Amino acid sequence: MMSLILYGYWRSSAAYRVRIALNIKQLVYESRAVHLSREGGEQHHAEFHRLNPSELIPVLIDGELCLNQSLAIIEYLDETYPAPRLIPERGAERYQVKALALDIAADIHPINNLRILQYLTAKLGVADEEKNRWYRHWIDKGFQGLEEKLRHTAGEYCVGNRLSLVDVCLVPQVYNAERFDLDMSRYPTLQQIAARLRALPAFAQAAPENQPDAC
């Protein structure tokens, strides 16, 4: 039986991040799908609720440890399975990497995740086109700032020439932006880095369309 078990959903940005990190570290894990819209959302079912009462994915199981929050999971993986590191061990670069990752995971992503979009349409009666405009507006605002920051930090990847937590966060967010038809040509630095990252096996294998539960 595998020690590492990842509960996720093929299109979840947060689960996508963890898949990338697991692949970069070449860790073998069992993937268990939690369908976010089937049967009212499997994340609300009792079995998953016991794992995470917040009813959000991803959740990582490692032996007796049950951990949620994608960035916490990746930091745990980085400390437990450190080769290769995604968060520098010390120095200013450590905090630069964390800050840029949080720009994506804490500022850009949360206001556009599935439960927010579902609330806009199901509870507030927002039409799909207006919902899509909402999505593009907030992604654009976030990407404008991120583009400017990465112009100063980027080398081959988001921070210099080594893969980091920022790269792990960037690609899933770009994937979602493209799903909602955001014009990525406005962010050439993000676009170039994302294209470079997507060509790497660890990122390609983690892509939503390559997951067993993709539909």
From Swiss-Prot:
Pfam family, one: GST_C_3
Pathway noted in the entry: Amino-acid degradation; L-phenylalanine degradation; acetoacetate and fumarate from L-phenylalanine: step 5/6
Enzyme Commission code: 5.2.1.2
GO-annotated molecular function: glutathione transferase activity; maleylacetoacetate isomerase activity
Annotated keywords: Isomerase, Phenylalanine catabolism, Tyrosine catabolism
Keyword Isomerase: yes
Stored SUPFAM superfamilies: GST C-terminal domain-like, Thioredoxin-like
Gene3D superfamilies for this protein: 1.20.1050.10, Glutaredoxin (3.40.30.10)
Statement: the UniProt record of this protein carries the keyword RNA-binding: no
Record-annotated GST N-terminal domain positions: 2-85
Signal sequence region: none
Catalytic activity: 4-maleylacetoacetate = 4-fumarylacetoacetate
GO biological process, one term: glutathione metabolic process
Domain GST C-terminal as annotated: residue spans: 90-215
Entry-linked InterPro entries: Glutathione-S-Trfase_C-like (IPR010987), Glutathione-S-Trfase_C_sf (IPR036282), Glutathione_S-Trfase (IPR040079), Glutathione_S-Trfase_N (IPR004045), GST_C (IPR004046), GST_Zeta (IPR005955), GST_Zeta_C (IPR034330), GST_Zeta_N (IPR034333)
UniProt GO cellular component terms: cytoplasm
Protein family (similarity comment): Belongs to the GST superfamily. Zeta family.
NCBIfam families on file: maiA
Name recorded for this polypeptide: Probable maleylacetoacetate isomerase
Provenance organism: Vibrio cholerae serotype O1 (strain ATCC 39315 / El Tor Inaba N16961)
